[in-house]
């Protein structure tokens, strides 16, 4: 299943990654910091890194996946799409 959440913010550590810095590695929490930071990965969405690291709220669609990075295993979000909260209503009406 694909999930959607809103009002997420950078929890420190979000950055562009990949050979051409085109992907986004996220460390995020909700706007009220009620949840522990989550890790996520977004292919081709590094263009959002500057706005996210300025703590602008964002929404995302994602799948859950298990990351097996020896010796640990943890859940991470495989981000399918992402947008800033300020763009969300416009993007929803376009569909």
Set out the residue ranges of the language-model regions.
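Acidic, two-metal ion nucleic-acid-processing modules in DNA metabolism proteins
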Residues: 1-95
